[in-house]
Amino acid sequence: MSTITSTNETNFVIDNDEVKGRQIISKRIYQCGELIFQEQPLVLAQFEWNKLYKYYACEYCLYPLESCEQNVRRLCQDSSIIIPHSECDPNRNIDQQIVRCPKCNEMYCSIICYQQAMNNYHLTLCQSNENQNKDQLIRHIIDLWRNVHPPPETTSISLVLKIMAMLKQSNNRLLLLQELQKFSQGVQSENQQFYHKLLRKEFESQVEQLRYALEQFNEQYMQIVEFKWFLTSNGFRQLLALLGRNQQGIGTSSLAIWVKNCEALSIPQQAVAAAVVTSDISQFIDAIYTKIDDISGEFIDCEGSGLFKLQSCCKFY
């Protein structure tokens, strides 16, 4: 049995199926490449190893916080590289645009993102040294996560921390909990069981350490009664399964933005741009990607994951 939920969109509806969970059902035929919808995530977080290795990105929206040249030089470990056609890089003056939290130095791409983060969760999670025990526990939780989830990464424990902080700061916890509850529909389906790799038996002790640390964080600093069940042994496993099943990957790159803008240039402009460094800009781009692959491998982008209310409905069975 399923129920249909109407949306503000005219081209699709949300079907709540008892077995498959939420699904988007189209009301018309779409053409290949056509945009169906756009949405902001309920919450997102950069991967912990990705952040540790200085893939600089906005803490709130994951927009890259390097110029293309800075990005390429870091990935290639070559400070002599000069990127042609700098006007194709919207991040060429990004150093002057970065907004930092005055207390913890966390970076944001704009004052808007900083204010949104503060309003939603950062007021709670800001590691300002005003409460060193709390800051130390947050770092301990993140370190535990890195120990059990090396690259290539698939999710981040910061998603859980942010959800807890959002509940702490929310004026309407019930509404936020209802939104989170929607993501859990179908997680325990007998016909479509999802197993997050952290739920494998060899990770049991590490998962328990994480759960206990988060439980202590809630008891000592959050005091979110409504979240206590998610920090029980069974509840925490369900929470990880919920994230693993519903999250969407997010990747951003100042190099990719520059390449896309270069491809949009007219042929004469491309020739001028390429002449700065090489006779053919496409060859220059290919050479850059080859060098990045040799030095940094597949780890090119600022990467993270997020929970999107609509995109999480787009599953393939």
Language-model features: where?
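Short alpha-helical interaction motifs and adjacent low-complexity tails used for partner binding
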Residues: 1-317
